[in-house]
Each structure stands twice: as C-alpha cells, then as structure tokens.
Amino acid sequence: MLCAIYRSPKRDQTYLYIEKKDDFSRVPAELLASFGKPQFAMLLSLNERKSLATADIEKVKSALVEQGFYLQVPPPPESLLKMHLGETKA
C-alpha cells in the first residue's frame, strides 16, 4: 500500500496521508481549508514498514482504506507546571 504524505503550511508538525498523490477528493473541504495548501513531503510504502515514527501504522492503513486519508497532528505540548507540581508532591 502506497501513500502520499503532505505537510501543512499552517500547522507545524501536521501531516496529511492520502491514498494517491495529489488526489484530495476524499478529504473534507473543511479539513483542507484549515490544513492550508498541502506541501508534498514524500511517497511511502506502508507494506514494507512495521512502524512509523509518530503514528500507529495500523491506524494509518485503516483510515486510508475507510476514509481515504489520515491526519497526523503533533502531540500536545508538555505542561511544565504539571511536571513541576508532580515532582514537588513526591
């Protein structure tokens, strides 16, 4: 299974995976509007991989088949205050 990966010019560390390069027909218009003009990053074969750096490969494959796309967003920022408070309680 091949997929094309695009980076968002509007949102840092946000990527859109689609089944076919430059075919955004299954991606909702609202998502594309908030994502910005997709910037091509790479073509990737998911069959030859067991994992991805920051996304669950099985979720990516499933979303591509069911929805035609997968949106990868960055993890939430760490709360340094919560970390500090947790350390002071211990």
Swiss-Prot record:
The cross-references to InterPro entries, in alphabetical order and at most eight, read: YcgL-like_sf, YcgL_dom
| Location of the YcgL domain | 1-85
Source domain of life is: Bacteria
Q: Name one Pfam family in it.
A: YcgL
The name this protein goes by in its record? YcgL domain-containing protein YE2368
Organism for this UniProt entry: Yersinia enterocolitica serotype O:8 / biotype 1B (strain NCTC 13174 / 8081)
What's the source species' lineage? Bacteria, Pseudomonadati, Pseudomonadota, Gammaproteobacteria, Enterobacterales
